[in-house]
A protein has these predicted regions:
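Small-residue-rich hydrophobic transmembrane alpha-helices
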Residues: 1-48, 85-104, 211-275, 306-328
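Hydrophobic transmembrane alpha-helices of multi-pass small-molecule transporters
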Residues: 3, 115-120, 145-149, 220-224, ...
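Residue-level hotspots within pore-lining transmembrane alpha-helices
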Residues: 4-5, 45, 49, 79, ...
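Short runs within selected transmembrane alpha-helices of multi-pass transporters and secretion channels
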Residues: 9, 78-96, 104-115, 133-148, ...
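Hydrophobic/aromatic residues in alpha-helical transmembrane segments
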Residues: 12, 53-54, 91, 118-119, ...
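Short alpha-helical transmembrane segments in multi-pass integral membrane proteins
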Residues: 16-81, 125-180, 237-302, 343-388
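Transmembrane helical elements of multi-pass membrane transporters/channels
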Residues: 77, 111, 140-144, 148, ...
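Membrane-water interface regions at transmembrane-helix termini and the short interhelical loops
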Residues: 91-99, 119-128
Length: 388
Protein backbone atom coordinates (compact mmCIF):
# COMPACT_ATOMS: atom_id res chain seq x y z
CA UNK A 1 0.00 0.00 0.00
CA UNK A 2 2.79 2.40 0.93
CA UNK A 3 4.69 1.53 -2.24
CA UNK A 4 1.76 2.48 -4.46
CA UNK A 5 1.35 5.77 -2.59
CA UNK A 6 5.03 6.46 -3.34
CA UNK A 7 4.54 5.57 -7.00
CA UNK A 8 2.19 8.54 -7.36
CA UNK A 9 3.18 10.88 -4.54
CA UNK A 10 6.97 10.55 -4.79
CA UNK A 11 6.69 10.75 -8.58
CA UNK A 12 4.22 13.62 -8.81
CA UNK A 13 5.60 15.92 -6.11
CA UNK A 14 9.11 16.34 -7.64
CA UNK A 15 7.47 16.97 -11.03
CA UNK A 16 5.30 19.64 -9.40
CA UNK A 17 8.38 21.20 -7.75
CA UNK A 18 10.13 21.44 -11.10
CA UNK A 19 7.07 23.09 -12.68
CA UNK A 20 6.84 25.53 -9.77
CA UNK A 21 10.48 26.45 -10.40
CA UNK A 22 9.58 27.14 -14.02
CA UNK A 23 6.66 29.31 -12.92
CA UNK A 24 4.14 26.92 -14.48
CA UNK A 25 1.56 26.82 -11.68
CA UNK A 26 -1.26 25.50 -13.86
CA UNK A 27 0.71 22.43 -14.90
CA UNK A 28 1.76 21.85 -11.29
CA UNK A 29 -1.92 21.88 -10.30
CA UNK A 30 -2.77 19.45 -13.11
CA UNK A 31 -0.08 17.12 -11.77
CA UNK A 32 -1.62 17.39 -8.29
CA UNK A 33 -5.16 16.72 -9.53
CA UNK A 34 -4.13 13.78 -11.69
CA UNK A 35 -2.17 12.30 -8.79
CA UNK A 36 -5.21 12.53 -6.53
CA UNK A 37 -7.40 10.75 -9.10
CA UNK A 38 -4.94 7.90 -9.54
CA UNK A 39 -4.35 7.55 -5.80
CA UNK A 40 -8.06 6.93 -5.27
CA UNK A 41 -8.28 4.51 -8.22
CA UNK A 42 -5.26 2.53 -7.04
CA UNK A 43 -6.59 2.45 -3.47
CA UNK A 44 -9.93 0.98 -4.54
CA UNK A 45 -8.20 -1.62 -6.71
CA UNK A 46 -5.81 -2.64 -3.92
CA UNK A 47 -8.67 -2.92 -1.44
CA UNK A 48 -10.56 -5.39 -3.63
CA UNK A 49 -7.49 -7.48 -4.53
CA UNK A 50 -6.03 -7.66 -1.02
CA UNK A 51 -9.37 -8.43 0.62
CA UNK A 52 -9.71 -11.39 -1.75
CA UNK A 53 -6.15 -12.67 -1.19
CA UNK A 54 -5.38 -11.55 2.36
CA UNK A 55 -4.76 -14.94 3.96
CA UNK A 56 -2.22 -16.29 1.44
CA UNK A 57 -0.52 -12.88 1.36
CA UNK A 58 -0.23 -12.82 5.15
CA UNK A 59 1.18 -16.35 5.23
CA UNK A 60 3.76 -15.37 2.60
CA UNK A 61 4.94 -12.63 4.96
CA UNK A 62 5.43 -15.03 7.85
CA UNK A 63 2.02 -15.39 9.53
CA UNK A 64 1.63 -18.79 11.19
CA UNK A 65 -1.33 -20.83 12.37
CA UNK A 66 -0.83 -19.32 15.81
CA UNK A 67 -1.35 -15.71 14.70
CA UNK A 68 -3.09 -15.83 11.31
CA UNK A 69 -6.49 -15.18 12.94
CA UNK A 70 -5.28 -11.94 14.52
CA UNK A 71 -3.58 -10.89 11.30
CA UNK A 72 -6.74 -11.47 9.25
CA UNK A 73 -8.86 -9.55 11.78
CA UNK A 74 -6.50 -6.58 11.59
CA UNK A 75 -5.98 -6.48 7.83
CA UNK A 76 -9.70 -6.88 7.05
CA UNK A 77 -10.48 -3.63 8.85
CA UNK A 78 -7.24 -1.87 7.90
CA UNK A 79 -7.94 -2.34 4.19
CA UNK A 80 -11.18 -0.37 4.55
CA UNK A 81 -8.99 2.67 5.09
CA UNK A 82 -6.69 2.05 2.12
CA UNK A 83 -8.01 5.09 0.26
CA UNK A 84 -7.25 7.29 3.28
CA UNK A 85 -3.73 5.86 3.56
CA UNK A 86 -3.09 6.46 -0.14
CA UNK A 87 -4.31 10.06 -0.01
CA UNK A 88 -2.41 10.81 3.20
CA UNK A 89 0.93 9.38 2.09
CA UNK A 90 0.62 10.41 -1.54
CA UNK A 91 -0.71 13.96 -1.25
CA UNK A 92 1.43 14.97 1.73
CA UNK A 93 4.38 14.93 -0.67
CA UNK A 94 2.78 17.86 -2.52
CA UNK A 95 2.75 19.91 0.67
CA UNK A 96 6.46 19.25 1.18
CA UNK A 97 7.03 20.08 -2.50
CA UNK A 98 5.89 23.65 -1.77
CA UNK A 99 8.43 23.99 1.02
CA UNK A 100 5.68 23.94 3.66
CA UNK A 101 7.42 21.36 5.82
CA UNK A 102 5.67 22.41 9.04
CA UNK A 103 2.26 21.71 7.51
CA UNK A 104 3.50 18.37 6.15
CA UNK A 105 4.86 17.42 9.56
CA UNK A 106 1.57 18.45 11.19
CA UNK A 107 -0.27 16.13 8.81
CA UNK A 108 1.80 13.21 10.08
CA UNK A 109 1.47 14.22 13.73
CA UNK A 110 -2.32 14.48 13.45
CA UNK A 111 -2.59 10.88 12.29
CA UNK A 112 -0.02 9.59 14.76
CA UNK A 113 -1.52 11.49 17.68
CA UNK A 114 -5.05 10.33 16.88
CA UNK A 115 -3.89 6.73 16.69
CA UNK A 116 -2.02 6.98 20.00
CA UNK A 117 -5.13 8.36 21.72
CA UNK A 118 -7.61 5.92 20.18
CA UNK A 119 -5.53 2.73 20.42
CA UNK A 120 -5.84 2.20 24.20
CA UNK A 121 -9.51 3.21 24.11
CA UNK A 122 -10.49 0.71 21.42
CA UNK A 123 -8.09 -2.07 22.46
CA UNK A 124 -8.48 -2.03 26.25
CA UNK A 125 -11.44 0.14 27.29
CA UNK A 126 -13.82 -1.23 24.65
CA UNK A 127 -12.08 -4.60 24.60
CA UNK A 128 -11.85 -4.82 20.81
CA UNK A 129 -8.29 -6.13 20.83
CA UNK A 130 -6.46 -6.20 17.51
CA UNK A 131 -9.63 -5.10 15.72
CA UNK A 132 -9.62 -1.98 17.86
CA UNK A 133 -6.07 -1.17 16.74
CA UNK A 134 -7.19 -1.46 13.12
CA UNK A 135 -10.23 0.78 13.66
CA UNK A 136 -8.04 3.39 15.38
CA UNK A 137 -5.63 3.30 12.45
CA UNK A 138 -8.41 3.80 9.89
CA UNK A 139 -9.87 6.76 11.81
CA UNK A 140 -6.43 8.33 12.19
CA UNK A 141 -5.72 8.04 8.46
CA UNK A 142 -9.17 9.44 7.66
CA UNK A 143 -8.54 12.54 9.77
CA UNK A 144 -5.06 13.03 8.27
CA UNK A 145 -6.35 12.72 4.71
CA UNK A 146 -9.16 15.23 5.34
CA UNK A 147 -6.66 17.68 6.84
CA UNK A 148 -4.34 17.35 3.83
CA UNK A 149 -7.14 17.71 1.26
CA UNK A 150 -8.58 20.77 3.01
CA UNK A 151 -5.15 22.41 3.04
CA UNK A 152 -4.42 21.65 -0.62
CA UNK A 153 -7.86 22.94 -1.63
CA UNK A 154 -7.40 26.19 0.31
CA UNK A 155 -5.78 29.45 -0.66
CA UNK A 156 -2.86 28.74 1.68
CA UNK A 157 -1.51 26.16 -0.76
CA UNK A 158 0.78 27.40 -3.55
CA UNK A 159 -0.81 24.80 -5.83
CA UNK A 160 -4.49 24.09 -5.25
CA UNK A 161 -6.37 20.84 -5.53
CA UNK A 162 -9.19 21.86 -7.86
CA UNK A 163 -12.10 19.51 -8.77
CA UNK A 164 -11.60 20.30 -12.47
CA UNK A 165 -8.08 18.84 -12.33
CA UNK A 166 -9.03 15.60 -10.55
CA UNK A 167 -9.17 13.39 -13.61
CA UNK A 168 -7.17 10.86 -15.58
CA UNK A 169 -4.89 12.28 -18.26
CA UNK A 170 -1.48 11.86 -19.85
CA UNK A 171 0.27 13.85 -17.15
CA UNK A 172 0.38 10.54 -15.29
CA UNK A 173 3.12 9.22 -17.60
CA UNK A 174 5.99 11.44 -16.32
CA UNK A 175 4.62 10.98 -12.80
CA UNK A 176 4.88 7.20 -13.08
CA UNK A 177 8.33 7.24 -14.68
CA UNK A 178 9.74 9.28 -11.80
CA UNK A 179 7.75 7.46 -9.12
CA UNK A 180 8.89 4.07 -10.36
CA UNK A 181 12.20 4.23 -8.46
CA UNK A 182 10.74 4.75 -4.96
CA UNK A 183 7.97 2.29 -5.86
CA UNK A 184 10.50 -0.40 -6.76
CA UNK A 185 12.53 0.29 -3.62
CA UNK A 186 9.47 -0.20 -1.42
CA UNK A 187 7.69 -2.99 -3.29
CA UNK A 188 10.86 -5.06 -3.43
CA UNK A 189 11.00 -4.87 0.37
CA UNK A 190 8.07 -7.29 0.23
CA UNK A 191 10.07 -9.63 -2.00
CA UNK A 192 13.14 -9.30 0.20
CA UNK A 193 11.14 -10.12 3.33
CA UNK A 194 9.80 -13.28 1.72
CA UNK A 195 13.29 -14.34 0.54
CA UNK A 196 14.79 -13.61 3.97
CA UNK A 197 12.04 -15.42 5.87
CA UNK A 198 12.15 -18.53 3.70
CA UNK A 199 15.96 -18.71 3.86
CA UNK A 200 16.15 -18.02 7.59
CA UNK A 201 13.51 -20.63 8.32
CA UNK A 202 15.38 -23.19 6.22
CA UNK A 203 18.92 -22.53 7.45
CA UNK A 204 18.32 -21.16 10.95
CA UNK A 205 14.82 -21.60 12.32
CA UNK A 206 12.31 -19.43 14.18
CA UNK A 207 14.88 -17.62 16.33
CA UNK A 208 16.68 -16.36 13.24
CA UNK A 209 13.40 -15.19 11.67
CA UNK A 210 12.60 -13.30 14.88
CA UNK A 211 16.11 -11.83 14.99
CA UNK A 212 15.87 -10.57 11.42
CA UNK A 213 12.50 -8.99 12.23
CA UNK A 214 14.09 -7.11 15.13
CA UNK A 215 17.05 -5.96 13.03
CA UNK A 216 14.88 -4.76 10.13
CA UNK A 217 12.52 -3.02 12.57
CA UNK A 218 15.45 -1.08 14.01
CA UNK A 219 16.66 -0.27 10.52
CA UNK A 220 13.23 1.19 9.78
CA UNK A 221 14.01 3.86 12.36
CA UNK A 222 17.15 4.76 10.42
CA UNK A 223 15.20 4.75 7.15
CA UNK A 224 12.54 7.08 8.56
CA UNK A 225 15.18 9.69 9.40
CA UNK A 226 16.99 9.41 6.07
CA UNK A 227 13.68 9.56 4.20
CA UNK A 228 12.83 12.67 6.18
CA UNK A 229 16.02 14.34 4.94
CA UNK A 230 15.11 13.31 1.40
CA UNK A 231 11.60 14.76 1.59
CA UNK A 232 12.99 18.00 2.96
CA UNK A 233 15.76 18.49 0.41
CA UNK A 234 14.12 17.09 -2.74
CA UNK A 235 11.66 20.00 -3.25
CA UNK A 236 14.55 22.47 -3.02
CA UNK A 237 16.48 20.55 -5.68
CA UNK A 238 13.40 20.25 -7.90
CA UNK A 239 12.34 23.90 -7.64
CA UNK A 240 15.79 25.28 -8.37
CA UNK A 241 16.40 22.74 -11.13
CA UNK A 242 13.18 23.91 -12.79
CA UNK A 243 14.28 27.53 -12.34
CA UNK A 244 17.71 26.62 -13.79
CA UNK A 245 19.49 27.86 -10.67
CA UNK A 246 22.22 25.25 -10.82
CA UNK A 247 24.25 27.00 -8.14
CA UNK A 248 21.47 26.39 -5.63
CA UNK A 249 20.93 22.88 -6.98
CA UNK A 250 24.60 22.19 -6.31
CA UNK A 251 24.32 23.48 -2.74
CA UNK A 252 21.20 21.40 -2.05
CA UNK A 253 22.82 18.27 -3.49
CA UNK A 254 25.87 18.78 -1.29
CA UNK A 255 23.60 19.01 1.75
CA UNK A 256 21.73 15.88 0.60
CA UNK A 257 24.90 13.80 0.38
CA UNK A 258 26.32 15.07 3.67
CA UNK A 259 23.03 14.51 5.51
CA UNK A 260 22.42 11.04 4.11
CA UNK A 261 25.94 9.69 4.53
CA UNK A 262 26.45 11.20 7.99
CA UNK A 263 23.08 10.15 9.40
CA UNK A 264 23.36 6.63 7.99
CA UNK A 265 26.88 6.16 9.37
CA UNK A 266 26.16 7.57 12.83
CA UNK A 267 22.88 5.74 13.36
CA UNK A 268 24.03 2.31 12.23
CA UNK A 269 27.22 2.71 14.25
CA UNK A 270 25.08 3.15 17.36
CA UNK A 271 23.05 0.05 16.46
CA UNK A 272 26.21 -1.97 15.84
CA UNK A 273 27.80 -0.81 19.09
CA UNK A 274 24.86 -1.74 21.35
CA UNK A 275 22.91 -4.50 19.58
CA UNK A 276 22.00 -6.43 22.73
CA UNK A 277 20.52 -3.31 24.33
CA UNK A 278 18.24 -2.67 21.36
CA UNK A 279 17.34 -6.35 21.01
CA UNK A 280 16.17 -6.40 24.63
CA UNK A 281 13.50 -3.83 23.71
CA UNK A 282 11.79 -6.50 21.63
CA UNK A 283 12.44 -9.80 23.41
CA UNK A 284 13.70 -11.43 26.59
CA UNK A 285 14.88 -14.56 24.77
CA UNK A 286 18.65 -14.99 25.32
CA UNK A 287 18.91 -16.99 22.08
CA UNK A 288 17.35 -14.22 19.98
CA UNK A 289 19.34 -11.50 21.74
CA UNK A 290 22.51 -13.49 21.07
CA UNK A 291 21.74 -13.78 17.35
CA UNK A 292 20.96 -10.07 17.07
CA UNK A 293 24.18 -9.24 18.92
CA UNK A 294 26.23 -11.29 16.45
CA UNK A 295 24.40 -10.37 13.25
CA UNK A 296 23.54 -6.70 13.69
CA UNK A 297 27.13 -5.47 13.04
CA UNK A 298 27.27 -7.69 9.95
CA UNK A 299 23.91 -6.55 8.60
CA UNK A 300 24.59 -2.79 8.90
CA UNK A 301 28.25 -2.85 7.81
CA UNK A 302 27.53 -1.43 4.36
CA UNK A 303 25.12 1.34 5.31
CA UNK A 304 27.72 4.08 5.49
CA UNK A 305 28.58 3.51 1.82
CA UNK A 306 24.90 3.03 1.01
CA UNK A 307 24.40 6.62 2.17
CA UNK A 308 25.95 7.57 -1.19
CA UNK A 309 23.07 5.87 -3.00
CA UNK A 310 20.50 7.57 -0.79
CA UNK A 311 22.06 10.94 -1.58
CA UNK A 312 22.26 10.15 -5.29
CA UNK A 313 18.69 8.84 -5.38
CA UNK A 314 17.44 11.97 -3.64
CA UNK A 315 19.22 14.26 -6.11
CA UNK A 316 18.30 12.29 -9.24
CA UNK A 317 14.60 12.13 -8.39
CA UNK A 318 14.64 15.82 -7.45
CA UNK A 319 16.05 16.67 -10.88
CA UNK A 320 13.55 14.42 -12.66
CA UNK A 321 16.11 11.85 -13.82
CA UNK A 322 13.81 8.83 -13.93
CA UNK A 323 15.94 6.29 -15.83
CA UNK A 324 18.94 6.57 -13.54
CA UNK A 325 16.74 6.43 -10.43
CA UNK A 326 14.96 3.29 -11.62
CA UNK A 327 18.26 1.59 -12.47
CA UNK A 328 19.66 2.22 -8.99
CA UNK A 329 16.49 0.88 -7.36
CA UNK A 330 16.60 -2.29 -9.46
CA UNK A 331 20.36 -2.76 -9.10
CA UNK A 332 20.49 -2.89 -5.31
CA UNK A 333 17.49 -5.08 -4.58
CA UNK A 334 16.87 -7.26 -7.64
CA UNK A 335 20.30 -7.55 -9.25
CA UNK A 336 22.36 -7.71 -6.05
CA UNK A 337 20.44 -8.48 -2.86
CA UNK A 338 18.00 -11.21 -3.92
CA UNK A 339 20.59 -13.37 -5.76
CA UNK A 340 23.07 -12.99 -2.88
CA UNK A 341 20.45 -13.91 -0.27
CA UNK A 342 19.56 -17.00 -2.28
CA UNK A 343 23.09 -18.21 -3.06
CA UNK A 344 25.37 -17.28 -0.12
CA UNK A 345 23.61 -19.58 2.41
CA UNK A 346 24.51 -22.59 0.25
CA UNK A 347 28.20 -21.97 1.05
CA UNK A 348 28.30 -20.26 4.45
CA UNK A 349 24.94 -21.10 5.99
CA UNK A 350 22.51 -18.69 7.63
CA UNK A 351 25.18 -16.00 8.03
CA UNK A 352 25.10 -15.61 4.26
CA UNK A 353 21.60 -14.16 4.40
CA UNK A 354 22.74 -11.42 6.78
CA UNK A 355 25.95 -10.87 4.78
CA UNK A 356 24.01 -10.34 1.54
CA UNK A 357 22.78 -6.98 2.85
CA UNK A 358 26.14 -5.18 3.40
CA UNK A 359 27.59 -6.53 0.14
CA UNK A 360 24.66 -5.19 -1.87
CA UNK A 361 24.58 -1.92 0.10
CA UNK A 362 28.26 -1.15 -0.42
CA UNK A 363 28.30 -2.19 -4.08
CA UNK A 364 25.19 -0.20 -4.96
CA UNK A 365 26.54 2.83 -3.10
CA UNK A 366 29.70 2.83 -5.22
CA UNK A 367 27.74 2.31 -8.45
CA UNK A 368 25.32 5.10 -7.47
CA UNK A 369 28.17 7.51 -6.84
CA UNK A 370 29.68 6.86 -10.26
CA UNK A 371 26.31 7.10 -12.04
CA UNK A 372 25.41 10.32 -10.28
CA UNK A 373 28.77 11.91 -11.12
CA UNK A 374 28.37 11.11 -14.82
CA UNK A 375 24.73 12.27 -14.92
CA UNK A 376 25.33 15.49 -13.01
CA UNK A 377 28.29 16.45 -15.20
CA UNK A 378 26.13 15.89 -18.28
CA UNK A 379 23.32 18.07 -16.91
CA UNK A 380 25.61 20.92 -15.88
CA UNK A 381 27.38 20.91 -19.24
CA UNK A 382 24.02 21.04 -21.02
CA UNK A 383 22.95 23.95 -18.83
CA UNK A 384 26.22 25.80 -19.46
CA UNK A 385 25.74 25.35 -23.20
CA UNK A 386 22.24 26.88 -23.02
CA UNK A 387 23.53 29.89 -21.10
CA UNK A 388 26.23 30.73 -23.63
Amino acid sequence: VTAFASLIGAGGAPRASIELGRGNFKKAERILGTSAAFLVAIALTLTVILQATKEPVLRAFGASDANIGYAVDFITIYLVGTVFVQLTLGLNNFISAQGKTTIAMTSVLIGTGTSIILDPVFIFVLGWGVKGAAVANVIAQLISSVWIILFLASGRSAIRLRPSNIRFNRVIVPILTLGLAPFIMQITECLINVVFNVGLQRYGGDDYVTSMTIITSLMQVVSVLTNGFQQGIQPIIGFNFGARRMDRVRQAIRVAFIAQITSATVLVSILAAFPSVFAAWFTSSPEVIGIVTRMMPVFVAGWGVFGIQMGAQCALVGMGQAKQSVFLAIFRKIIMLVPLALTLPHWIGVTGIFLAEPISDATSGIVAGILFYVTYRSLTRADDAKNR
